[in-house]
């Protein structure tokens, strides 16, 4: 996904980390997705819009960046479960798109099919600028950030090498998780804080 040097690299902003609350038996009591913003040449892209009740936190995070909901140009949902797309309605000016595997969403931003949790699951792969890059040359100026949705919902899934508990096809879920791990420098999971796979 190399880019010409005269082109702007996308920048990634976490508006809200995801979370998941389970009872002692492991049953899900509450699930709230990560909400991620990408600045691109094509405009502002929001990936997943969260659950009902997250509106205030999302709008405040946008305001902290000097943005309003009307500034969002494109919505991409990693899948169609309500904890990931319930707030699409907040961004009425934005166009919701449904990219296919490998489709270029914007320069430096591409869809990656990651089925298993749901048939329509995708992840968003971003060739992201690191601001500021380290001046000593020890870190790349870009990192591959994968906004994984529920294909890789938590750090625990990565550490234990287990797919999401909720899935329609376990083999596909494992393959999708492994695909993300092989590509990503940084993962923004569906229901946890971002974590780094490579320094």
Residues covered by each model-derived region:
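Short loop/helix-cap segments at secondary-structure boundaries that form the rim of catalytic
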Residues: 6, 85-92, 103-107, 198
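Conserved catalytic cores of phosphodiester-cleaving nucleases, focusing on short active-site segments
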Residues: 45-47, 147
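Metallo-beta-lactamase
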Residues: 53, 113, 119-199
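Short hydrophobic/aromatic-enriched beta-strand-loop microsegments
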Residues: 71-72, 94-100, 147-149, 166
